[in-house]
Design a protein with these regions (language model features):
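A structural motif corresponding to the C-terminal end of an alpha-helix
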Residues: 52-62, 199-218
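Flexible, glycine-rich phosphate/dinucleotide-binding loops
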Residues: 19, 73, 225
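Conserved small/polar residues in nucleotide/adenosyl-binding loops
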Residues: 241
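Short glycine/serine- and acidic-residue-enriched loop/turn motifs that recur at repeat junctions
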Residues: 20-26
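Conserved SGNH/GDSL esterase-like catalytic core that processes O-acyl groups on lipids
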Residues: 26-194, 198
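Short amphipathic alpha-helices and their capping/turn segments at secondary-structure boundaries
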Residues: 1-9, 91-112, 202-213
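Structural recognition of the beta-strand scaffold that forms the well-ordered cores
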Residues: 9-14, 18-19, 64-68, 111-115, ...
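Conserved, well-ordered alpha-helix/loop/beta-strand core segments that scaffold catalytic motifs
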Residues: 215-236
Length: 241
């Protein structure tokens, strides 16, 4: 049964998954604070999940708003839902967003989805991996961001191993990488979970204050590399808690 056109307003809060990063038609511009994705609020690709939800509900771009922000961590969104601004740059992710219209979009919504938590573990891991390899790992980070390592098949494992071989690491760099894989990433995920959970509660509370009548949907976090046990445990916990 076809829905009545524009019967509700849907607003999606989230990170690069929400924004549709990885799809070739995502549009954004670089600026002094990182990237400007304001065009993507309504100009997002139809293939991203906001586009698919909007299409299924018969909503136009004024009634299906995509507030996905690449690199955003949950602590950043705590600020953004309150004022639409980040007081300072997130030095780990290298992003700083300033969109006062955020608050107005939240107030006008009938349904609000929240997809966050991935970057709370992913960003510190990418930074730690970069430091361990003296930043030879940027190509591997790009592969992770592309989504090509999201499977758990033998082909995915081979792709990960092949990417690691291409880094041409020194002995000390290899030792640092193995330490990160076997202990450092566990610590990163252990630290990320309580912070992510606490921040999500604050975000939901603020959204309810701004718009007590809106329906709020929490969307599970996406694990970019299921082959890594520490990440699998983290993302399973975040998605089902």
């Amino acid at each position: 049964e076809e829905k009545e056109p524009n019967s509700i307003t849907y607003v999606a809060l989230g990170d690069s998954i929400c924004a549709g990063i990885g799809l070739t038609t995502v549009q954004y511009a670089h600026n002094l604070m990182g990237v400007d994705v304001s065009f993507n609020f309504k100009g997002y690709p139809e293939a991203c999940y906001v586009g698919q939800v909007g299409k299924s509900l018969n909503l136009d771009r004024d009634h299906a708003i995509n507030l996905g922000l690449p690199g955003v961590m949950s602590k950043d969104m705590v600020e953004l839902v309150k004022t639409g601004t980040m007081a300072e740059m997130n030095t780990l992710s290298g992003c700083q967003y300033n969109y006062p219209e955020f608050v107005d979009y939240i107030k006008s919504a009938d349904v609000i989805s929240i997809q966050l938590g991935s970057n709370d573990a992913f960003v510190p891991t990418v930074v730690s991996f970069g430091e361990a390899t003296n930043w030879k790992s940027e190509d591997l980070a790009s592969i992770v961001l592309s989504g090509n390592l999201r499977g758990s098949s033998k082909e995915t494992e081979d792709a990960l191993n092949e990417s690691l071989k291409k880094l041409s690491l020194t002995r000390s760099e290899k030792d640092a990488v193995w330490n990160l894989f076997f202990s450092g990433m566990n610590k990163i995920c252990e630290n990320a979970y309580p912070e992510s959970s606490s921040n999500l509660r604050q975000i939901v509370a603020t959204v309810k204050e701004l718009n007590p009548d809106a329906q709020i949907l929490i969307i599970g976090a996406t694990n970019p590399v299921p082959l890594l046990p520490s990440w699998s445990n983290y993302f399973s916990t975040v998605s089902y808690t």
